[in-house]
Swiss-Prot record:
It comes from Pseudomonas putida (strain W619). GO terms for cellular component: cytoplasm. Its cofactor is Mn(2+). One of its GO terms (molecular function) is metalloaminopeptidase activity. Keywords: Aminopeptidase, Cytoplasm, Hydrolase, Manganese, Metal-binding, Protease. This is Probable cytosol aminopeptidase. Presumably involved in the processing and regular turnover of intracellular proteins. Catalyzes the removal of unsubstituted N-terminal amino acids from various peptides. Its EC number is 3.4.11.1, 3.4.11.10. It comes from the Bacteria.
Amino acid sequence: MELVVKSVAAASVKTATLVVPVGEGRKLGAVAKAVDLATDGAISAVLKRGDLAGKPGQTLLLQNLPGLKAERVLLVGSGKDEALGDRAWRKLVASVAGVLKGLNGSDAVLALDDIAVSNRDAHYGKYRLLAETLLDGEYVFDRFKSQKAEPRALKKITLLADKAGLTEVERAARHATAIATGMAFTRDLGNLPPNLCHPSYLAEQAKELGKAHKGLKVEVFDEKKIKDLGMGAFYAVGQGSEQPPRLIVLQYQGAKKSDKPFVLVGKGITFDTGGISLKPGAGMDEMKYDMCGAASVFGTLRAVLELKLPINLVCILACAENMPSGNATRPGDIVTTMSGQTVEILNTDAEGRLVLCDALTYAERFKPQAVIDIATLTGACIVALGSHTAGLLGNNDELIGQLLDAGKRADDRAWQLPLFDEYQEQLDSPFADIANIGGPKAGTITAACFLSRFAKAYNWAHLDIAGTAWVSGGKDKGATGRPVPLLTQYLLDRASA
């Protein structure tokens, strides 16, 4: 769907559907008053009948009003005089989108300048959230359905903005479009079945991205190279599978070669049975989403490429399939990581940290400004934070603050958990330098403590997206595309710093 931004009078636009807000108590803002005046009071007359209370997200569709070039006018409730919060604003936009999808019009014009959103400026902040909501709502995954979704009539939405804010709303639409593209790519990868989306498939996706963007350097390391690099922990995870592991490295140079890069490291476990420490069968199909960390790095890179951000970015994807077999890693095995530290593998279902630790060591060679790893790492994070916010831990307060701020502004929030030294003791092993699990307490924190031992050479943060990367069960089941908005916002901020 195309997003267009214009600065024209709402009452004069020719469109299939004009969307206008109405406050509670039938209050009309400046835009609605102008449209009402053009219709000789037709909107006021309808409102007096009490068909629309004006509560946020309520809608009323009017046809063929006099004095307008718009075929329809969709009134949407905007609530009381106070500004809407992000959640209410998203719900309002989604309500409008739901009505528009059911109409046969090919275009719509949204005249929503009169609605204020708390903690967001009237132009960029408000309209970026609107545009992302509209575009993300267009996502459909029906690749494996014999009956595809019907093509939607709606092809274009025009956002009306005042002249003073036109440039900022255009910027918001451009950024939102790039983020939505990245989220859709992330969701596609996550939703693919694991018999198709395995480590080699992700490697092919990286190569295709490299072909489409000539400035993108792509390297794919096979299992022999992974072993030769000394990545004993990473290699151990994939050795039980017929699908060989792959380390994928993508380098984007948007700034001077001498500028230190930002590094994103993604966990790419394309299917996680738990290995010899086998998971329960119920719900195991959702373990195809255990590669959503890697998928979100792919999606963020797509957004960065589309926006041509003036930064240097390295993306490292540690991809493997965790399967039980006669060759699989056993509980009690000890492996040597690329850093030289030894790990006693007490639970083969704590495999994400094993692929990530070697990838984090590999990241040192890029002398990064900051490294962020993204992983569906612990069920404990879902217990602690649910599905609304990602867990965030790290070794640098400034980096943590930047990510928290980016999450708030992108409406893709994270929440900081502690990384106190006392938790490190839970990882002590009598036989190796470190155990790969720390017992039942503070599972998200001890997993991050494990990773922190491999991230001492740089500023590092860890995003645990186990609760936010996908929706379980029901009609809405599927990958969410998070945390692409948070990560892209963080990089946008660094690009403009």
